[in-house]
UniProtKB/Swiss-Prot annotation:
PANTHER family: UPF0178 PROTEIN YAII. This is UPF0178 protein RSKD131_2223. The lineage of its organism: Bacteria, Pseudomonadati, Pseudomonadota, Alphaproteobacteria, Rhodobacterales. Belongs to the UPF0178 family. Transmembrane segments: none annotated. HAMAP family: UPF0178. Pfam families: DUF188.
Amino acid sequence: MTDLYIDADACPVKAEAERVAVRHGVRMFLVSNGGIRPPAHPLVESIFVPEGPDVADMWIADRARTGDVVVTSDIPLAAKVVAAGALVVKPNGETLTQANIGNALATRDLMADLRSADPFRQGSGRPFSKADRSRFLDALERAMRKAQEAGRSASGGSEAGS
């Protein structure tokens, strides 16, 4: 069965992800160290983890598997869950796969090196837009369909009626 995991701290698309999860009838886990409003829908569960570096990421990485979808901007977390067989969608609609996760990790490391070399470098990106939100919804919808199919295949097709 497909689960949807949201790396919820500072995630701008929680409401959109919830709509997609409810439409597909899948459980959604909002994983954070607090500060988010509890969900109203019974398919959506808030998971509050202790504060600390990467605690929410570790919670997600320990559970995500083939047939699941993870929404995160965290590239190291994405690498872990892609290795476990999960599909990854970033809030801007970009998907991360076995084919592109190595490049994403290398780019992340390069940008971290550039930022550390120039302490006066300000802001690194453009604001989140309606177009990003639209791309996210489209990418998440496609990922959910693909994950549900992968989940059925991984379980030998035993999820009749899904």
